Amino acid sequence: MNLRTFKKGVRPSEFKEFTDGKSIEILPLPDEVFIPVQQHIGAPCKPVVEKGMDIKTGQIIATAGGFVSSLIHATISGKVKAIESFPHPLSGQGLMIQIISDGKDEWINTGENVPKVREWEKLSKDEIITDVQNAGIVGMGGAAFPLHVKLSPPKGKTIDTLILNGCECEPFLTADHRMMLEKTDDVILGVRLIMKALGAEKAIIGIEANKPDAIEKITKAIAPFPNITVQPLKVKYPQGAEKMLIKAALNRNVPAGGLPMDVNVVVNNVGTAIAVTDAVMRKRPVIERVVTVTGKGIREPKNVLARIGTPFQNLIDFCGGLTEDAAKVLMGGPMMGVAQHTLAVPVIKATSGIVCLTSESIVDKKEYPCIQCGACIRVCPMDLMPTRLARFAQNCKWDEAEKFGIVNCIECGSCAFVCPSNIPLVQRIRIGKLKVNEIRRKQKTVEKVESN
């Protein structure tokens, strides 16, 4: 098997065995959902419903706040109880629409949502993109970038290749793996629809070698389509990061500060492809997603299909509850996931996993001074100098941080993973990135005002 990869990176323990052999289970409808108006990169959405309104599943409840934004739909039928701030899994608190279920799961325009045979080959590029936009599809792998924007590259940017990300390189997570096995046809049709929308000549489905069953099944499914290939990849982190995946699959280098479309590529996730099939073939918006609930801190690890807005507590209860020694719950994997302060936070479009860790796996490490060992530099997939960037950020040296490429950091956590001094490199670099980007925005605003 010809296994490709990128240079550098790390090899953390996989911990996939908890759930990689477990079929997706459907979570019972929640009694209530809390649907954030900010679930994506870009402008937050604007609520178009009011307290006390009756709502049906699939109904638009918040409109896009700009081109780089995404529609939000009701994920259950019932009544709007509140539109106010609630705990958010990424931002601590956020504006949400709380809906109390009527237990009916009654869809809006039910007749239009019944699956039907649709001759999608006759659809235009614009028709597919409109369906995607109307469905509120964002990148389901975690980035949550509005898909209709990705499918609309600027003039002069042509896309020749679609790469479907089936790596799922974060430890513990297996949702994408299970979807490739259980929803294979929808994955492949989604790839073909995205290719048509982009005008892409070919597609490559990148899958890490620790998923041989998925490689085999997807390879069989694409046999009739010579312009779609499967590329097995070495098991390494962060193989699923866009720039690393493009390098491994195509040997193309995305320029510093650039985007995949700069090298004529678009990267999408397995779950995103399925969402496109749902949107185009079934007129079904994004109301649910597969979430891996796993770790030694959960009694019955599972892959769960849950409605957006469902509190984490519901999923954890469905999986038998936390163990007595559970100490931390993350949204996402252990490398890039976010620790949660409450289980009242809801599943959002970017929730790929809920990882429950026990006290034995959480070590309170003492930080020591940097010993200049260079370990962080040797593993950084972006060829940065993490220890220097962290030091610049700590000392508020923003110009130097920008000069040494702090905004190019993808925050994968590889540097912190190998640091023998236990320095919180990613946290410091993240703060530095925020500050540098803030300074950049202010400078652009000033320049715009002065030019007028």
Locate predicted features.
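N-terminal, Lys/Arg-enriched amphipathic/low-complexity engagement segments
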Residues: 1-48
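Short, well-structured beta-strand-loop connectors
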Residues: 50-63, 82
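Conserved hydrophobic positions within beta-strands
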Residues: 78-80
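Acidic low-complexity segments
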Residues: 87-145, 156, 212, 229
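Gly-rich Lys/Arg/Thr-decorated short loops/hinges at beta-loop-alpha junctions or inter-strand turns
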Residues: 108-109, 162-176, 297
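Histidine-anchored nucleotide/phosphate-binding helix
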Residues: 181-196
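Hydrophobic alpha-helical positions that pack around
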Residues: 201-312, 318-325, 333
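Ferredoxin-type iron-sulfur electron-transfer modules in oxidoreductases and energy-metabolism complexes
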Residues: 351-367, 375-377, 381-452
